[in-house]
Amino acid sequence: LILLLTGCAMKSTQIKTVDKVDIDRFMGDWYVLAHIPSYVEKNAFNAVESYKLNEDGSIAKTFTFNEGSLDGPVKTYHPKGFVIPGTNNAIWGMQFIWPIKAQYKIVYLDKDYKITIVARDKLDYVWLMARSKTLPHDQMIKFRNMIEGMGYSLDNYREIEQE
């Protein structure tokens, strides 16, 4: 009963994804510039997510960052992604621990595939990523406001320093 009540009390929404993702163009390195982090990445610096399309259609992700500071110990994780059929490649299940697949929704993607926002309906985590290590301040504010407009609380929103 407690789990049921807790689940009902969690904030959730249906965040709209982009219409379509060209999966091949999305592959490669993305610098995480800001996020509402999961526990694992709450002290991340130099965070980079790298995606590679496997022959079976799954996505090999390598998530690397320095823990605690720009020169902190390097942490690396290798979750596996699965595109959800019928979503035009815009919704994935990201598997860190078998058999659980966490929702991963591509909710913003510029036409040049240089900036993206990945979010979740639970409004618990979000990632602003770019192909470059920095964005101009006005763009960072624009995307922060966009994330807030999706319904996210910005209490734990954090920009990630990149070296």
Stretch-by-stretch model annotation:
Residues 8-163:
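A beta-rich soluble binding module of mature secreted/lumenal proteins
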